Regions:
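Flexible, compositionally biased loop and terminal segments
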Residues: 1-228
Length: 228
């Protein structure tokens, strides 16, 4: 990078293309998700090595429950595996937060979420990895408004933000979507109003360290006016 002082404070990833990657190589969808898991862990390592304070990964949306029961069940098993691997690979390097509608998941997975957050909370000053599971931007905003009304607080931008599932996470400076699609797909609609968007054709399992580095370099060259 030309300017290390312009590292983003928060990067968001829409990890798209696992199934199409698998199909392009003649494999079932689940194979693509497993390959995507390896890329996810590698990118987490790169984020931490670069000392980017926050990164959020869109892993499973509220709409993804509509997929076939077999694929959903395979993904739930993969989530448990990923969380176990993350616990070891990121040990004492960062905090891990799971954001989304926890109530959609089985109790054993919810317990995994609670344990992982509790065990890593002390390392938030070293970085925080946010994983969006059963996440949808509209669902998040609906839940935030319900919580805000119940609290009796005055409605403001600040109070709404404080009731979001992502409360405490800075708005992403960068959103990276792999897989060629050019939309946000219900990802962080409140938080991305000033995000720099990077849409890349590479399927998520094929996304590389060099590609991420090039995006960081391009971001460093951009002048962000934020409405000014």
């Amino acid at each position: 990078m030309n300017n290390m002082n312009k590292l983003p404070n928060c990067v968001g990833f829409i990890m798209d293309g696992n199934r199409r990657y698998a199909e392009s190589l003649g494999h079932e969808a689940v194979w693509g998700h497993v390959a995507g898991k390896d890329t996810f862990l590698a990118v987490v390592d790169q984020v931490l090595e670069a000392k980017i304070p926050h990164a959020i990964f869109y892993a499973f949306s509220t709409e993804n429950w509509k997929r076939s029961p077999g694929e959903v069940e395979a993904l739930l098993g993969l989530f448990k595996q990923v969380l176990t691997e993350m616990k070891e690979s990121t040990k004492e390097k960062c905090a891990i937060r799971i954001v989304g509608r926890w109530s959609d998941f089985r109790e054993d997975l919810q317990e995994n979420f609670r344990e992982l957050e509790a065990e890593t909370a002390a390392y938030a000053s070293r970085g925080t990895i946010w994983i969006a599971l059963s996440y949808g931007g509209r669902a998040e905003l609906t839940a935030a408004v319900e919580s805000l009304v119940a609290s009796g607080e005055v409605v403001s931008e600040e109070s709404i933000a404080a009731h979001l599932w992502t409360a405490g996470m800075p708005d992403p400076d960068i959103i990276i979507r792999t897989g060629g699609e050019q939309r946000l797909s219900n990802f962080l609609p409140w938080q991305t109003v000033y995000s720099e968007l990077f849409f890349v054709p590479t399927y998520w399992p094929a996304f590389t360290k060099d590609e991420f580095t090039r995006i960081l370099s391009a971001y460093a060259e951009r002048e962000r006016r934020i409405g000014k």
